[in-house]
C-alpha cells in the first residue's frame, strides 16, 4: 500500500536545514496568491522539508470539491485520496525520474526548469484529466528544492502521462519514456507568422470559421497545428 512517505526520496531530501529561512515564506505565498487572482489555474506551494503544502489557492480546478484549507491539511495525502489508484504509481515514477534528472543539472540553472505531466483527479467519483507543472521556487545552496510552485490546468491530451522537462529559455525539452525509463531530447517546432496568428485567434476564443474570415490563408496552417489548440 502506498504512503505519503513514498514521495520523499534521497533525491529530494533537504540536507542543509540551517539554510531554511521560514521568515520569508509569506513573500512566496503573497506572490502565489497574486498569480492565483489573475489566473483560472490552480496554484499551490510544496514544502519539501516539512513534507506538506505551504499554500493552496481557492481556484477550483485542483480542489476536487474540497476547500483550500482541507487540501492544504491533506498535503501529500491528497494524491492518495484524490488520484485514481492505478495512476499513483505513475506519480511516484515521475517523481523519482524528475528529481534524478533535476539533480544532474548545474545548480545555477535549476530554477529555469519545470516538469510537466498529466494525471486524473477524482471529483465526486468523476475522473478529470489535469496538467500539472512544477518548478523550483526556493533552493538551498546545494541546489535542493526547498519550496516548489505547482500550477494545475486542464490537460490538452486525452490520457495520463506525457512527462516532459522544459527549460524556460530553450526550445529543447526532454520527454520521459515510461517503458524504457529514459529521457529523450526533443525540439519544439518553430511556428510561422501565419501559424502564430491562427493560434493567437484561437486562444482569444475564435472558431475556425471566424478565424478563416479574418485570415483567408488559414487552411495552409491548420493541418500543421495540433487540433487541441483549435476549439
Each model region followed by its residue ranges:
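PAS-family sensory domain signal
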Residues: 20-78, 169-183
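Sensory/regulatory domains in signal-transduction proteins
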Residues: 46-69, 74-161
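Juxtadomain coupling helices with adjacent low-complexity linkers
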Residues: 154-183, 188
